[in-house]
Amino acid sequence: MESRPREITTNQLGVHEDLTCIVNKYRQSEFKKPIAVHTKEAFQQVIDWLGDWQGDVIIDACCGVGESSIVLAQQYPNAMIIGIDKSVARLDKYAYYKRQQTDKSVNKRVDRGIENVKVFQADLNDFWRLVANYSATAQWKISKQCLFYPNPYPKKSQVQKRWHASPAFVALLTCSRRIEVRSNWLTYLEEFQQALQLHDVKSFIQEVSGAPITPFERKYTESGQQCWQLQTHAEGEER
């Protein structure tokens, strides 16, 4: 019998009061942390896999077991999907999720000939910087980035571990400003939205609808928890 997923427990009320200061600090400074060798190698594997591709590329960041990467590959058959996660243990489960097939009318996962998706083990702090530096000369373009249920680090003292309050956020936005983030902690998305605003990026937040696309989302919705999504506006779009 599976245990009920825990709801977010936090000692933080609302958007962190230091968020603006933190985001602005990283906007005005350079992220100088050395890039790990294993992520450089993973990035080269991505380049090799894409080969002479000249179309859209979608990054599924924090992809976990890669179920969402497979869903994205089905939703965007004319794009190449790159799933990135730091955990080898999670990525080892990818083959299982890619093999699974169901006939549910609202959640059909048929794995016939899905060749436009691959997952890689890498540190996103480094991977985003490598993509940002390479993208100016790349034949392909990052058309969208997805962060589905990233670790929310809900303790107030952990704010700078959240992606939008980390030094990697600048590189993330350099890769692509078309972003979708999902979480079962609304405050996480409200903070992400505020960080985007500080970079002049507009976004909106709404409840998640439709079939679950990750194991976490499935567990949350089945236990009655509300899930939320943030999406940025396309350039020139208003809502």
Regions found by a protein language model. Name each.
Residues 160-168:
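Charged helix-capping and loop-helix junction motifs
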Residues 1-57, 67-75, 98-138:
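S-adenosyl-L-methionine
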Residues 188-195, 199-239:
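Class I S-adenosyl-L-methionine
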